Amino acid sequence: MATSLPTVTHATGRFDYALPAPLRSSGSQLNIYLIDVAQSPLPAGALPAQAWKARLAAALAPKSGSHAAGVLTREFELPGGVPAAWMRLTPSRPDLVTLLALRAVPQAGAAVSMEVEGSAGREPLAEGVFADLAKSWVAGSTQGFSTGTGAFVIQPSQNERASESFAASGIEVSIQTETVEEPDDGESSLQLPQGAHLVLKQHRNVGGFDGVERRVRLADEGAGERLSYLWIFAGKPADGTAPRIRLAATALAPRAGALDETWNTLLSTWRLRPAGAR
C-alpha cells in the first residue's frame, strides 16, 4: 500500500523502519550486553571533557525522593581515552556499584553514555566489556545496534532490549524488541480486553519474521471507539538478530485511515539491520 504522506526512516536497536513524517519520537530505552546506553547531542563547540563533567554530575545528583548524593569512588579512562567512573548511588546498598562512561564524537555532534549497576567485586570484567562497547560505537553507522544517528557495530549479544514510542495527531506507535531465553508469543498480550471487538487476527510475515497480527475495536470512555493494532514475533532463544518483537499502534476510530497508513508503512518497511560485527 503506497502512503500518501512523506515518510522518515528510523532505527531502534537492531531494526530499521519508516513512519509517516508527522510522527515524532517520544523517547527510547536501549540496553545491550546488560548495559543501559543512550545517545545525546553534543552542542557545537562543546568539549568532550565538558560533556563528561555534566553527565557525571547528573548521575551523582540526589535522585527524586532522596537527599543523598551519589558517591564517586574512582574516576579513570577506558582505552582510547574514554572517561569513566565508578560510583555508589544507593546508600542502603553499599554492595552495589555503578559504572558510567561517555564517548563523545565532536565531529558528529553526538555522545553516547553507557551505564550499568552490579555487585562489587566484578569491576575488571565490567570495565573490559565497557571498553569493547565504547570502541565499537560508530557515529552515522547504518549497521549494528542503533542508538539514533550512531550504532554499536559489535557482535549481537544474548541480552539486548530496545524500545521507542512515537506520537502525532492522535496516533501512538510503540516499538519493543527484547532477546528471550524461550520464544514468547505474547499470548497474554493477544487476549482481548473486556468489551473489545476483534476486527482481525492473522499470521503475517513482517520483514522476514513470521508473527501474529491482531486488530481490535474497543470503547474509549468519553471519546467513542478506539482502534488498537498489535503484531508480535515470538523470538528465538538468546538470538540478538531474532528477538521478541512487539509492534503496536492505536488511534480513535475517526483516525482509522491515518492509522491504517501508519501501520502498513511500519510493517512494510520493517527490516533487520546488518550486524556489521567486527
Predicted regions span which residues?
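Acidic, serine/threonine- and glycine-rich low-complexity intrinsically disordered segments
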Residues: A111-V212, A223
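A short acidic-to-branched-hydrophobic micro-motif
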Residues: Q29-S64, S113-E117, R161-G195, E213, ...
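N-terminal mature-domain "stem" immediately C-terminal to a signal peptide or N-terminal signal-anchor/transmembrane
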Residues: A2-L47
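Acidic, serine/threonine-rich low-complexity disordered tracts
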Residues: D210-R215, A223-L227, A238-G240, T250-A253, ...
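Low-complexity, Gly/Pro
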Residues: S28, T98-S113, A275-A277
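Short, surface-exposed beta-strand/loop "edge" segments at domain boundaries and coil↔beta transitions
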Residues: L42-A46, R93-T98, A120-L125, E221-L227, ...
